[in-house]
Amino acid sequence: MKVTAELKKRIVALDRCYRSTWDTHTIGHVVRLSHTTVAKILREFRGPRPKRAKQPHTRRTKFLRRDVMWSSDFVRVGWGWLLLVTMDEHSGYILGWDLVRSEQAMAVVEHAESILARMGRAPLVWKYDHGSAFTSDVFQGLLDDCKIVPYPIAPHSPWVNGRKERDNQEVHNWLIPLEGLEVSREQLDREIDEGMLIRNFVKPRACLGFRKSAEVYFSEDAALDADDEVRGWFAQSLCDAKWELGAPNPDEVYEIKKSGERLHRKAVRLALQKEGLYEEWDVAAQEGLEDGPSEAEVVNRTSAENVSI
């Protein structure tokens, strides 16, 4: 079939009319042309299909002490297993990990209690996603008993948990040599234990000035004595921040309603900043001041900041 100028106009008109949501197969069916011919015509008159602009992640964060915030997450590692991991946000030190079959509340509680007992200390804030195991009454009760402020991230938003997500990818990369093999629970345990040992004690991390995670976590400079008095000061700072933000229940520190999570997260960050435990800034204002790519475009950053909150 000869492709006339009128037919080309019709193809372009269909594409514009339906805002480029019709693919070449659909348009080809309507005008009785092959999808490859339609694609060539659209490439000539329209160019690439319009794409939604992606908002760059330009906010950077930095925790100034250990045990300010811990974050927990489940990682699907394969062979029917999930890996439950908890990490210190300041140093990237992996505090604990457990293989589990499913996301169960009691598994999270046992995991958390084991870390708290072994480390002999607790964080000021505990970050987690909206999985039912973390939002369960038993885990929330544990946080309340230990006077740990909960920090649920926004639902379906893994990009706000950037440091933890990159750590999860490192776990997957470590297990690549096992793909396609039959692996027992004992073998998988050994492989993960070895990977975590290297991750904590052997690997120099660029974002830590090429120091090791364990070296940073256990250094005296990073120590935070989060005793009852410090927790009381932080709780008061959090209440003050919520009051300034106009939260309906500013006195809610350890129990938060789902409708108030967004204000709660902002108040936590403000309170941590006030106590000198956390910094955040936007690099967008700095773009154009230096030669080379902007920091927002650099994926493998080597400075001691992240976008994980």
What are these regions (language model features)?
Residues 1-69, 157-158:
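Basic, flexible linker segments flanking DNA-binding modules
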Residues 11, 27, 38, 73, ...:
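Mobile genetic element proteins and their domesticated derivatives, centered on retroelements
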Residues 36-87, 93, 105-114, 118-124, ...:
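Mobile-element integrase/transposase regions
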Residues 128-130, 134-145, 150-176, 184-193, ...:
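RNase H-like two-metal-ion nuclease catalytic core shared by retroviral integrases
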Residues 173-309:
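C-terminal domain-tail junction helix/linker
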Residues 100-104:
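A short acidic/small-residue loop/turn micro-motif
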Residues 87-88, 158:
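Hydrophobic alpha-helical segments, especially N-terminal targeting/anchoring helices
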